[in-house]
Amino acid sequence: MLNSFKLSLQYILPKLWLTRLAGWGARKRAGWLTKLVIDLFVKYYKVDMKEAQKPDTASYRTFNDFFVRPLRDDVRPVNTDPNVLVMPADGVISQSGKIEEDKILQAKGHNYSLEALLAGNYLMADLFRNGSFVTTYLSPRDYHRVHMPCNGILREMIYVPGDLFSVNHLTAQNVPNLFARNERVICLFDTEFGPMAQILVGATIVGSIETVWAGTITPPREGVIKRWTWPEGESEGSVALLKGQEMGRFKLGSTVINLFAPGKVTLAEQLQSLSVTKIGQPLAVSTELFVTPEAEPAPLPEEEINAEHDASPLVDDKKDES
């Protein structure tokens, strides 16, 4: 009964105006009132402030400053294996798995269209048909900066206007085509693992979506699709980001969807629905292992070569092998 009421509110409430109001309030500097709101938020959602660079809530001038707070450098170590792609966000796995032609799993018994998610861009959709996907939900308590799973060169960004449904598990299970309906920012990267899309999905109360290369993408909300492109390769004007580097952020929580081309990566076995994710942990592994070539030793001078041949071993073979 309660869930039915919550779902009804999703269709009845003026979500755009609520989002604008929340965004306005989150930008305001209100002194002691801002601190009070932050303290209540931290207590209600059990936010771990020990991970933040500034654990004292009094150090944040606005609620937005608190919400996009940076973490200490040591709390999210990034897996350095060149074959491993890492989690882009703190949160929980909503769904993950194979893209079946044009179908992506939203929740048990509910699929949505890959092409619709990509705003009808069938050329981009063709890159990912029968590939793999991971959907990560960021709850209000989570760190809300989004990072790169691997090194990447930005090729395209698309802003897609849309609804502002909540993107929690209740709505994912009950609102058809949720992620293809909501406002979103699609980022396409060239990577050593093939093309990768990282999609930032908006929601109710999400005041803005930002990227590190373009700043605030939304608002304003003008109701039209916008598209930007960048040159191929690392040339002047290109945007190249490193594995683990910040690429964007939400001001209030939402969802990140990653798309990978077929046959390029194998998703990590621990990716199960509702499993907790932390930035830097394994997301996927390359199907083609990259091996860093070992440098050949420099040739020895002739007298040293002769000395090596003449010398007797100083340790026995068994001890030398250890």
Curated annotation (Swiss-Prot):
The keyword Amino-acid biosynthesis does not apply. Keywords: Cell membrane, Decarboxylase, Lipid biosynthesis, Lipid metabolism, Lyase, Membrane, Phospholipid biosynthesis, Phospholipid metabolism, Pyruvate, Zymogen. Residues 306-322 have a biased composition (Basic and acidic residues). Is synthesized initially as an inactive proenzyme. Formation of the active enzyme involves a self-maturation process in which the active site pyruvoyl group is generated from an internal serine residue via an autocatalytic post-translational modification. Two non-identical subunits are generated from the proenzyme in this reaction, and the pyruvate is formed at the N-terminus of the alpha chain, which is derived from the carboxyl end of the proenzyme. Pathway: Phospholipid metabolism; phosphatidylethanolamine biosynthesis; phosphatidylethanolamine from CDP-diacylglycerol: step 2/2. GO terms for biological process: phosphatidylethanolamine biosynthetic process. InterPro entries: PS_Dcarbxylase, PSD-B, PSD_type1_pro. It holds the Pfam family PS_Dcarbxylase. It catalyses: a 1,2-diacyl-sn-glycero-3-phospho-L-serine + H(+) = a 1,2-diacyl-sn-glycero-3-phosphoethanolamine + CO2. Its main location: membrane. The record marks 253-254 as: Cleavage (non-hydrolytic). The modification Pyruvic acid (Ser) is found at residue 254. Disulfide bonds: none annotated. It is found in: Cell membrane. The active site is at 90 (charge relay system), 147 (charge relay system), 254 (charge relay system), 254 (schiff-base intermediate with substrate). It is a peripheral membrane protein. Its EC number is 4.1.1.65. One of its GO terms (cellular component) is plasma membrane. Its cofactor is pyruvate. Residues 294-322 are annotated as: Disordered. Catalyzes the formation of phosphatidylethanolamine (PtdEtn) from phosphatidylserine (PtdSer). Heterodimer of a large membrane-associated beta subunit and a small pyruvoyl-containing alpha subunit. This is Phosphatidylserine decarboxylase proenzyme. It comes from Citrobacter koseri (strain ATCC BAA-895 / CDC 4225-83 / SGSC4696). The gene is psd.
